[in-house]
């Protein structure tokens, strides 16, 4: 599957961040699905074509870590890249324990994101 056929789901409650991530993903040849909340993604998870999730830790409804736990409980196995404005060791450890393959501290360089995505979708 080429990068242009790989869909990355972005779950972030910040509309500007979702738009920026979708634009960046498109510029690098990926498809993007964006979701404004964990609940919105959970509602669509069974029909999502995503090969990887990029999830903000601090969401308006449930946290990104809670989303990862819910997906695992529902037998969905997406590679998850977590991102957060705070670089907190406790949150980072929770993200890793929830199965996160990367934890990105906002703002992060585009190349850091794409290195994590390449690791996730190989």
Give a label for each model feature.
Residues 15-33, 98:
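Two-component/phosphorelay signaling modules centered on CheY-like receiver
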Residues 18, 60, 88:
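The feature encodes the CheY-like receiver
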Residues 34-52:
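Acidic, metal-coordinating helix/loop segments flanking the phosphotransfer/catalytic sites
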Residues 36-37, 63-66:
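Acidic catalytic/metal-coordinating carboxylates
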Residues 65-76:
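Short amphipathic alpha-helix used as the core "switch/output" element in two-component signaling
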Residues 66, 87-102:
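Alpha4 helix (beta4-alpha4-beta5 surface) of REC/receiver domains from two-component response regulators
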Residues 90, 108-118:
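C-terminal output helix
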């Amino acid at each position: 599957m080429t990068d242009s056929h790989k869909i990355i789901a972005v779950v972030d409650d910040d509309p500007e961040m979702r738009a920026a991530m979708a634009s960046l993903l498109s510029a690098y040849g990926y498809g993007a699905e964006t979701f404004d909340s964990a609940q919105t993604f959970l509602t669509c998870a069974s029909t999502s074509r995503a090969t990887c999730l990029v999830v903000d830790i601090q969401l308006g409804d449930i946290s990104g870590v809670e989303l990862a736990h819910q997906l695992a409980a529902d037998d969905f196995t997406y590679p998850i890249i977590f991102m957060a404005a705070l670089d907190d060791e406790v949150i980072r450890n929770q993200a890793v324990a929830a199965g996160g393959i990367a934890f990105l501290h906002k703002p992060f360089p585009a190349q850091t994101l794409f290195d994590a995505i390449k690791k996730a979708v190989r």
